[in-house]
Amino acid sequence: MPRSSPRAWIAAAVFLGGCTAQPVIVDRPEGESRARLDESMASNVRSLGANGDWLVIRGYHATDNLVATLTNKPFSHAAVLDLDRDRVIEAESPGVHETPLAKFVAKAHRLMLVRPVWAGKGNAAAALEKARQLVGRPYDFLGLIGLDVPDRYYCSELTLEIYRPFLRPGDLVPRPVDPGQLHYWGRVLYDSGAR
């Protein structure tokens, strides 16, 4: 019986693994159907969401592809909903900033609306106010690898930081937290589903 070489086993594993792996890179579709989808997602967020909720997305940018690959999760970015202003507050490489809701939704391949477990009893209003105060702060590049730099924020760090005063004694929130983990600390109100 002939012996198989290690190369043959590796080639077989790669071939078979490729059959089960989901695509990591997603491209933004164009056209009228995409515009209808964007409007549907935004409408669901407006009707089901509240100030201080989290929007967790799978985006189309190269960094979204990188985050999805490294975390092996279907989500790559997160933001805080400011429903009163029809905006989100998000942390990206330029820093913490506001983005119109429609523009944020347009960069989403998939969108999940999450109500944080700490959002009750007026906490969401205080959390949103904290997020508004953090606009202009720099991005926390080192936080992505677990090295926290005070007064700098990456996307999911921002979403959790604004609720930090309301964490309960038993709430164990690891650092770093990737966007694909946020639903563990909330209730999913809407999920657009994968395309």
Regions found by a protein language model. Give the residues of each.
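Sec-dependent bacterial lipoprotein signal peptides
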Residues: M1-G17
